């Protein structure tokens, strides 16, 4: 009798759970179908509360080292909850002057480095006051004007706004836009923008998201005083010890000792890289994913890459869906990655979506810093990949069928320094739209230049029975990581997306 009663209770529980899960998924805004597909370098504007503590200056040094990867259209000194009444564009100018001393050496290694004069001309200031109170119809800072000029340019590429401090300069620009232009012109302007904000560091971010619901916005909403930063994905850059949220992560490349040995002792720009007070470079994830390394996560935040992985959902307290964290663990619709840690155990967290790549992006940083003082022959450079006859870094999309092997050939990849290459093919299980079916793939030859990927199912099984059955089509994101044996070891990537269809019936053959 007791056993029968418990069985009925379990059935009722699961039935109610399934109903709740169904309602939860039905009410969730589906991920946007748009994928940013453009040629050329990403357009970037940075808004920074530089001067309040070391980490903005650290991130700014890295930004300059990768300035050949972007079209920088503005660097705006702003306020934040940590610096409410002053901005410090002079710090940006000082760092750019140091960059100018090493630019000639950087040009020995790659093309596209802007001149120091050109960069200095792109430094602006926002209002030297805090938050929304500093905006209004009669106010227009040079920083807000720079945002409007950039957004008005005839350019099909999206414009990334990387917010390292308060968001009131962007709010100022958008308010002016609304007050001076027709609604269709405002909509056209806003559609160009891609915002990645390092939490909410003033009261402007929530206002922007509410007033401009069509605006692309990456953020984990937070209070303005920093008590919720520990939860944010961006802390995966280096916050393991300070925030106590990085179990499994390897901390050796984000210590002051490692930075002394690999960054601060490397020429004029390295000397400008301060010791961190709390964590290293908390703002860097906002542009780290824009680097053209083959992961291409800037095309869709749910693809995942050096800047983390996010899903499209409506967090509690927000007026609409944004690119953010969280999700439904029971159905595996979540922003978290499961990664093997340094101890061989598996760890699941939002921060892991960044720290899983840490050794690679820190080695990349160290190599670039060495470019500021070494000639080409005495420095290391990234492997150049070719997969199935396709060179470059753009993602490769392949139509596949369950049970039919897909050949992946990277044998023509090479290293510009003639070094030995090691290969690692793997399925990035969590990558892709949260509301899509994720296919299951088996990879053979995963540690060589030629691998075979065989889809075994169009849909990954869920932990609980899915309220909507698999319709026979799913996607799988495969990553090729190729690492050289130089010093430091450098890694390049290629993303292969398999559109997996159910096996054809015999009568169709």
Regions found by a protein language model. Give the residues of each.
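Bacterial N-terminal signal peptides
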Residues: 8-24
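Exposed beta-strand face motif in extracellular beta-rich ectodomains
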Residues: 472-478
